[in-house]
């Protein structure tokens, strides 16, 4: 193992639950405002997961007051306090970009049994 691999292995988190595109997550994000920090929960559907190792990222989409909001997080960042899997989604794609064009109940994802 070379030096970069050792540094990457030291930065990996082991408290990340298994999740896939289509799952609904609660991501507890540390928000720092001035000298204070607080935890903010971002709840949405995983529409993408890409990369590997330290550089792995995932994108979550939610609709807030009628406006679609997408946020991309690195999986192994220290800014994420914890990730909770709320529901498992039953989808057949790895990238759920088609959800951007759907409105209302059409954008709903079936729950895995």
Swiss-Prot record:
Belongs to the bacterial ribosomal protein bL19 family. This protein is located at the 30S-50S ribosomal subunit interface and may play a role in the structure and function of the aminoacyl-tRNA binding site. This is Large ribosomal subunit protein bL19. Gene3D superfamilies: 2.30.30.790. It comes from the Bacteria. The keyword Ribonucleoprotein applies. It comes from Corynebacterium diphtheriae (strain ATCC 700971 / NCTC 13129 / Biotype gravis). PANTHER family: LARGE RIBOSOMAL SUBUNIT PROTEIN BL19M, RIBOSOMAL PROTEIN L19. Transmembrane segments: none annotated. InterPro entries: Ribosomal_bL19, Ribosomal_bL19_CS, Ribosomal_bL19_sf, Translation_prot_SH3-like_sf. One of its GO terms (molecular function) is structural constituent of ribosome. GO terms for biological process: translation.
